[in-house]
Structures are given as C-alpha cells and as structure tokens.
Design a protein with these regions (language model features):
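N-terminal post-signal-peptidase region of extra-cytosolic proteins
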Residues: 22-27, 33-34, 51-79, 103-110, ...
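Exported/periplasmic cell-wall-interacting domains
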Residues: 24, 81-175
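Short, mixed charged/polar active-site loops
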Residues: 46-49
Length: 175
C-alpha cells in the first residue's frame, strides 16, 4: 500500500472509531427552571446542557394536577417508551413521598379543594408544538407549553434517551 493508501486507511479508521464511540452514560440530570436548562452530568463531571420548555405554571413546587407547574424536587427516571406525541417519554417518579406529604397537608388545611388530585405522568420528552422552534428568541410564555413536563427537541430526546439509563436521579430546582 502506498503512502496515500495508508493516509486514507488511517483517516477511515479514525472516522469509524470516533463514530463508534458512544457518548458517556449520564450519572445525574439537573434541571434549572428559571434558566430553562437541563444539564446531563456524567461520572467525570462533564456537562451537556440543553434548553428546555416547561409548564407555564411558574416557579415553585407543583401542588396539584392541572396547575401546569413543573415540580421541584428529587426524582428518578423510572421508565421510557416511544410516544406518538412526544417522540420518547422518559417518565419520572413524580409524585414522590415529599410531594404526597405536601399535597395531603394542603388538602387537610383547605388550601386545595377536597376533590383535588395530585397528578402524575411527569417526564422528559420531545415534541415541539407545530409552527415554532425553541431555538428562536421567544418569551418564557411562548416557550413554556407543557402540562408540567420537561420538553426538548425531538433529536435531543433521542440522544438523551440513549445516554440516560432508568434509575438515574433527576434534580429539578427553581434556579
């Protein structure tokens, strides 16, 4: 093989090895509601950041089903699956024990009506509303469209789902 043949072979080998190297698995997900960001952190501390859309219910903890608030707290990815509306849906373990305790206290003191329910089906998913792109410079009111979930672009949720195994912690804060 001549010199140019070796150069081509080395270039192809480098391309194949870099393409075959999967992104590192995620150790923790951190979602900052005010910043509208989701950070994927691997075991070495490397961070990948994505812009996110949330529920339009604003800052603070989720009180009840239908308040359109993205919850604040410590959760885990419990399972995932394909979704016609959201490409992939990665379900979180909301409500957790702390959420249930808060909800029951709010019902007991009359802050919430007797018929209120705590809700569920909170997750990380794709599915951008038709006609706009989260990459555009839009206001928070235009950006926040979910019922309390965390949404990224469809191509992003595909990449995220490959890197985040079930059971991984998800911390959501108001920062």
């Amino acid at each position: 093989m001549g010199l140019s043949g070796w150069a081509v072979a080395l270039a192809v080998a480098a391309l194949v090895s870099s393409a075959a190297t999967p992104a590192p698995k995620v150790a923790r997900i951190i979602i900052h509601k005010s910043a509208h960001t989701m950070q994927l952190r691997d075991k070495d501390g490397a961070v990948t950041t994505y812009p996110v859309s949330l529920g339009p219910g604003g800052a603070g903890v989720k009180h009840r089903e239908g308040d359109k608030v993205t919850p604040v707290g410590h959760y885990h990815v419990v399972n995932r699956g394909p979704s016609k509306s959201f490409t992939i849906f990665m379900r979180l373990d909301y409500p957790n024990a702390e959420d249930r305790k808060r909800f029951n206290a709010l019902k007991a003191d009359g802050t919430l009506p007797a018929g209120a329910t705590i809700g569920g089906d909170i997750g990380i998913h794709g599915g951008t509303p038709e006609g706009w792109n989260k990459r555009d410079d839009v206001t928070t009111a235009q950006r926040d469209w979910t019922l309390g979930c965390i949404s990224v672009e469809d191509d992003e949720i595909r990449a995220i789902a490959k890197r985040v195994p079930d059971g991984k912690p998800v911390d959501i804060d108001d920062e």
